[in-house]
Amino acid sequence: MELADKASFRDAMAHVGAAVNIITTDGPAGRAGFTASAVCSVTDTPPTLLVCLNRSASVWPVFSEHHTLCVNTLAAGQEALSTLFGGKTAMDERFAAADWQTGATGCPRLEAALVSFDCRIDQRVSVGTHDILFCHVVAITRHPEPRGLMWFGRGYHTLMRPAC
């Protein structure tokens, strides 16, 4: 059976909503960050996320040298920061655009993130053009912002937390 073509797959994936995240790291190879929507929960025992990173991305060499990262899930209103980390902007300029703390792993944690998952990279698997990073969560920081930022239909959208 033949595989679907690349264009059809990308068009179909535009119908799947995803949280917008900035993935950060810091260590001997330097500080780096990129925007990602290909992030999801794997299991809660142990708490594990997966992060997909294109091996042709400018940040790949840095992430390939490090064993920790922080998944910073963006809140509504942080579209410009997402765009900045998704482009060709220099790392110093990316990080200068927001306030950061040092997380439990030493990685940059976005102060105004909806939630931040400080992680240790446990396993790497290469599939096609990407590396899949399996990350054990060692610390979680939540922000009271009630609105999340989603990527759907090739654009940003706000998702409201329901009132309890």
Swiss-Prot record:
A Pfam family reported for this protein in Swiss-Prot or TrEMBL: Flavin_Reduct
EC number: 1.5.1.42
Catalysed conversion reaction: FMNH2 + NAD(+) = FMN + NADH + 2 H(+)
Species per Swiss-Prot/TrEMBL record: Klebsiella pneumoniae (strain 342)
A Gene Ontology molecular function term of the record: FMN reductase (NADH) activity
Annotated family: Belongs to the non-flavoprotein flavin reductase family. RutF subfamily.
Protein function: Catalyzes the reduction of FMN to FMNH2 which is used to reduce pyrimidine by RutA via the Rut pathway.
Alphabetical keyword list: Flavoprotein, FMN, NAD, Oxidoreductase
Gene: rutF
Protein name per the record: FMN reductase (NADH) RutF
Any one GO biological process: uracil catabolic process
Keyword Oxidoreductase: yes
